[in-house]
Amino acid sequence: MKKTVAVAVILSLVFCFTGLMSCKDNSAKKKQKEGELKQIKTIEKEIEKNVYPLPTSAQVIKMLTELEVGYQIGISNPAENIKKYYTLESRSINLGVYGADLSYATLYNIEQKVIDYMDAIRTIANDLNMSKIYNAPLYDSIKQNFDTRDKLVKILTNAFNETYQYMSENDQQTLALLVVGGAWVEGMYLTTNVSEAAYNVAGISKVLIEQKKSFDLYLDLTKPYMDDPMISDFVNNLEPIKKVYAGLTTSLTDQNIKDITAAINIIRNKII
């Protein structure tokens, strides 16, 4: 939705600029056009910077529900682990992790878990000045739409978008990327641990291939921030899955899925 709005804004600017140029002579038009196109690109980059860059964990978990995979008790990061996260880095990463766990509990209608993860997220969000996003009205919206997955995905995705946008607009881009990274890892962990033999789940291969695209994009997004120790440390932790994904094509064997699962388990154990 935000990307659609961004495109609409940019197009309206183009039309506006075109109208202004119609009354200028050719030389002035050319100079004005160059300046305006440069301004459009600047606006476009600013808009894109504030838009959640990957499919959200809610969208990923929805894929699992569509594969008719049952809810697995005990695979989410326990909400009580929040007491372990006292650094800015660990809190940001696990805000993303808990966002994925909230999506998992919500889309499988596990109400007590939804409450637990909302509480954990609210605690971290308060520390990061985002209490207005993960508030009582959000929980009420989730509760009122428990039986409508598409609406739940939209509600959660909006919350994640607002989180990313808030951080980006407040010069916390590195923290925003840690949140996105934590959510990606946990989404992958939930995906690969929905069964003792995930490779036997029909359709799981397609989900994991789609996540390779997200992973590659995520690495590209982190490149400008690799001088930040928090980003470089997190990206270094992703090395196991980077190595596995580097050798894959457009289809996965059972062994590929086992390798992905093992790599994600290693990474996840480091961040939670």
Protein language model features and the residues they cover:
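N-terminal Sec/ER secretory leader and immediately downstream segment
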Residues: Q32-Y139
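Secondary-structure edge/capping motif, primarily at the C-terminal ends of alpha-helices
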Residues: L102-N109, L128, K132, M167-N170, ...
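Amphipathic, well-ordered alpha-helical segments in soluble domains
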Residues: Y98, Y117-A120, I124, I155-E162, ...
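Bacterial signal peptide processing site
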Residues: K24-N26
